[in-house]
Amino acid sequence: MSSYYNKGDAPSWEALDQDGLDDVIDTSEYAYASRDHILFCIDAAQSMHKPYPDTTDESGQLVRGRSALHQALDVAQQIQRAKVLSGPDDSVGLLLYNVDPSAVAEDPGNYQPGNYVFQTLRTINAEEMKRLVKLMQTAKEQYEAQDDDETVETTEPEILRKTFPPIEESHEMNIANVIQTCNFLFRDGGTQLRGNKRVFWITDNDMPPGMNNRQPARTSYGDLTTYGVTAETFFIDRPDHRFNPNIFWNDILDREAIDYNDDQPDPEGLSSLADLMKDLVIKTSPKRTHFHVPLKLGKDGEIVIGVSGCSMVSEQGKGASRYVKMRGQVVEEVQSKTEYTSAETGAVLKDSEIGQAYEFGNEAEVRNILEPNPWEAHVKERAKNQNAVDHVLEDDKERRQREDEGEDLEEEEEDDKKGVEKWMGKQKAALPKIVARTRLQFSNEEVSQFRSMGIEPQIKVLGFQAASQLRFQDNLKHPFFIYPNEEEYTGSTRTFAALLNSCLKYNRHALALCRLRSNHVPEFCVLIPQEEKTSSNGQEYPPGFHLIILPYKDSIRPPPKKVAEFLQSPPIATDEQINAMKAVIKRTRFKAAAYRPEIYPNPSLAYHYDQLQALAFEEDWDPEDPAKQALDKTMPLYGGMHSRAGEFMEEFNKEIENDERAVEKLAAPTKRGKAEKETTVNEWDLRNIPDMWKKGTLSQCKVQELKDWAKHYHVPLQGKTKKADIIDVVSEHLSTSEDDLAGASSKKAKK
C-alpha cells in the first residue's frame, strides 16, 4: 500500500484505524496509509504530438525534443512500474481523449467516441502493464534512432501517432464528456476503490471546446467530486504560448483565479509532472498500528483509558521470499507445513507434547539425553537407592570417628572397600545408565508467565519527572507515538487530552511500566508529551506522547578505554583549521539547507526493486547500465564538491599536515606467518625438566613441553624449532644455572 498524503495534512486521532489486532495496517480513508487510485487523463490532440524544440546537454551533444504526449506517457509508465512494488494494492488507469475513433481498431464500448481507454482502472497488474511498457520501449527506440544531424527536423515516434492518432481540431471533444467518462471508469471499479481517488489531468489546451456552455462540465465535475474523486491538473506550456488556467479550467474545477503573468513558457513543458514523479516514486512502508493497550493512572490503576501506538521508525527490508511452484503460465505459492517427530519412535508430535527446555551446567558431559533420567524413575526405586546411599554414608561417618579415636581400621577398610565395589557393580548392572540433569523443561504457559512476570499488556504510569531527569544516551530503541483509543474505553480522548495538557503545563514527563504486546517483556519507559502545532498548511505535529523505552543496566556498556580517554582530553582544532573547515562546509551544504531522507532510497533496496521490476516485465538487467548505476542516490557528487570547495579542501589538508599532533607513528613491518597462540602455562603443569636433564631423559619430552618450560623460565630458544636443537639450548642453560634451578625444583617437590 502506498502512503500518499499532502504536505502538512497530518492525521488526527480519529483518522487512525481502530480495527484489527496488533501490527495491522491502517486502512482508513485518511492520510496515514490509504490506497491510491490514479486515473491518467491525457489529451492526445494534434498539439500534444508536436515535439518540443531541440536542446544541447552540458557536453554540447544534441538532445532531440520530445512531444508532450511522449513525456506524459513515459511518466505514467514509470509511476506504474514504481507502484508494482511500492503500492501493489493501488489502482492505475490510462484514458486518452481527442483520439480519432475511425483510426482506432478497438471499440470504445459504452464510452463517448474520441475517448480511448488504454487501461481500465484496476489493481496494478504486471501482465496488463506490459502493453504500455512495450509501447514506450518501441517509442524510445524510434526516438533514439533519429539522425544526430541538426538540420534534420525532429519527429515524434511513429508508434505513438499510430496508436493514438489525433482527431481533427474541429471535432475535438467537449470536456464535459471527458469528465463523464472519468466518472464511469471510477464507478466501474466498484466498492474496491477505497482510498485516495485522483485524476491526473494532462493537457496543453487552455481553451478547449465547451467554453461557451460550461454548465455541463461543472455538473460532470460535481458528480465526480461527490464520488470522492479529486482532480490534479498538470498544464503544459506550448513553445510559443504560456498556459492560462484562468480562462476555463479554474472555473470548471471550482478553483480561485491565480495571478497570471505572460512570462516565458516552460521550455520542458512538464516540469510539474516531473516533480510529481519524484514524489510518487518514493517507496515508503505503510504506517502500522503496533499495539492497543490500556493506560492506567492513579495509585492502583484506578483510572483506565485506551491508547494505541504506532512506530515512528522502522527498518524497511526486502520482504520475505516465498516458495512457489511453476505450472506452465500459472505460478502457485507452496503452502509450508512444519512437523516435529520423536527421535525415539519417529511419531509426529502434537503441539501439546512439545515444550521448551533450558540448559545449565556443563552440557559437554551429557553423552546421550535420550537415556532414562533418575528423576523420572519410580518412587520406590529411588527410595531404595537413597537408603543404600544413606547406609554407606553412615558407615563412613562411624569409621571416621573410630579412626579419630586411634583404632586401626586398615583390614576393615579393605573389606568394606571390596564390599562397596561389589555392591556398586550389582547396582550398575541392575540400573540403566543415567546422565546428568542439565535441562529444565517448561510448558509454553509457564514460559509465558516467566516472561510476563504476571503483568498483562498495559502502560502503568508510576509517576512524573522533570525534563532534566532525561538522558540522551538512554534512548536506545525505536520510539512509539501513542494516541487515545475510544474503542475499548469511552472518554479516553478527554482523559488523554487532560493528561497531555497537564504534562505540557508543568513541563513534566511520565515514568511508566509498560508491556506493549503479549509477546513482549515488561519494561520501563517514559512518556514525553508533544504539543500540537499547526501552520497555514494545516496540522504539522499531532498532539500525543512519545513512548521511549528505557534500557536495563545489562543493556548499557561503557565506551572503550581509548575512546573514554580521548573524550576526557580531546585535541582542540586551531583557529586556522576551524576557518578552513567552515569554508568547506559553507560550499558543500544542501541547497534546501535540510536533509530529506525520503529522497535518498536505500541503494540495496533500490537495486532489489529494480531487478524485480525487470523480472516482472521480462526485461534484461545490466548492472553496467548508467541508468542502473544512477539508482544509488547516496553516491556523493564528487565533481561538484571539488569544483566548489576543492581549493578550500586543499587548504584544510595543509593545515592538518602542518599540525604536529596529527603525525602518525608507523609500526615496524612484521613478517607474515602463523601467529603463535598465546597461552598461559601454570608452573605446576610443567614437566620437571631439570630432573629429566640430570637423568638424561630429555628426549622423552615433547617439543611443546620443552617450549613451555623455556618460555616460563625465560630461556631464549633463538628461533630453534627442531627438538634436538631445543634440547641443546635447554641443556646449556641448565648446565650454567644448575644450582638455581635445583633449588626451584626442590621447592616445587616440597609443595
Curated annotation (Swiss-Prot):
Question: EC?
Answer: 3.6.4.12
Q: Which Gene3D superfamilies match?
A: 1.10.1600.10, 2.40.290.10, SAP domain, von Willebrand factor, type A domain
Q: In terms of domain of life, where is this protein from?
A: Eukaryota
| Record field: catalytic activity | ATP + H2O = ADP + phosphate + H(+)
Q: Which GO terms describe its cellular component?
A: chromosome, telomeric region; Ku70:Ku80 complex
| Subcellular localization(s) per the UniProt record | Nucleus; Chromosome, Telomere
A GO molecular-function descriptor: telomeric DNA binding
Q: Report the source organism.
A: Cryptococcus neoformans var. neoformans serotype D (strain JEC21 / ATCC MYA-565) (Filobasidiella neoformans)
Question: How does it associate, per the subunit comment?
Answer: Heterodimer of Ku70 and Ku80.
Q: What is this protein called?
A: ATP-dependent DNA helicase II subunit 1
